[in-house]
A protein has these predicted regions:
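Residue-level signal for beta-strand positions within conserved beta-sheet cores that form or flank
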Residues: 11-13, 88, 110
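A C-terminal cap/extension of S-adenosyl-L-methionine-dependent methyltransferases
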Residues: 79, 118-179
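A structural motif corresponding to the C-terminal end of an alpha-helix
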Residues: 103-109
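A short, basic/aromatic alpha-helical/loop segment that forms part
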Residues: 44, 94-95, 169-171
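Conserved SAM-binding loop
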Residues: 1-77, 99, 176-179
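Short, glycine-/aromatic-enriched active-site segment of Class I SAM-dependent methyltransferases
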Residues: 68-93, 101-103
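Conserved S-adenosyl-L-methionine
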Residues: 109-119
């Protein structure tokens, strides 16, 4: 946790980690001020029930951050490889532009903003889909993955700058914030 001083021992912040069924979250109504659902909804058959659970555990006036794969980079992955979307536990849906926004705003939440993220990840997944989704040891794929991990762990320098430039053009994810 060295990279996150707010989680360090001297901090007064508290946090916990757990695993739960997204359709039956083990929390009382109105528990959290902030809720993050990142890269989950595309895996769940009844994603609307998951959204209802997210809304249930969010306090009135709370903020929700949610991300899903962006439509067109994800569609390319599906077109390049049947294995990509036929993997057990994998992506079973592609969200169209504004679909997720409507799913939240129709339930009373107000969109604060949205942005795109992971611009360097789209070409990585296209490469994986072209060469074989399970072939992650192939030289180019393996080294590209190392580059992505290095950029995520220390997001500075030329690679991070290039990634930020690519985010609005071909970011793999769309991120929404709602109040």
């Amino acid at each position: 946790f060295a990279a996150y001083p707010d989680l360090a021992g001297q901090s007064k912040s508290r946090f916990g980690l757990g695993v739960a069924d997204a359709l039956h979250l083990p929390f009382a109504d109105d528990t959290f001020d902030r809720v993050i659902c990142s890269e989950v909804l595309e895996h769940i058959p009844d994603y609307l029930a998951t959204i209802e659970e997210i809304l249930r555990v969010t306090k009135p006036g709370g903020r929700i951050g949610v991300s899903v794969p962006r439509y067109w980079p994800e569609k390319i992955c599906w077109l390049l490889s049947a294995d990509y979307h036929n993997e057990p536990g994998g992506h079973i849906r592609i969200f169209r532009a504004n679909e997720l926004e409507e799913d939240f705003t129709s339930r009373g939440f107000k969109k604060i903003c949205h942005h795109w993220a992971h611009g360097l990840h789209s070409p990585y997944w296209w490469l994986r889909c072209l060469l074989g989704v399970k072939k992650d040891k192939v030289f180019g794929v393996r080294h590209y993955h190392k580059l992505l991990v290095a950029e995520m762990m220390k997001p500075n320098g030329l690679v991070a700058t290039f990634g930020k430039l690519l985010d609005p053009i071909m970011g793999k994810s769309v991120v929404y914030y709602f109040d």
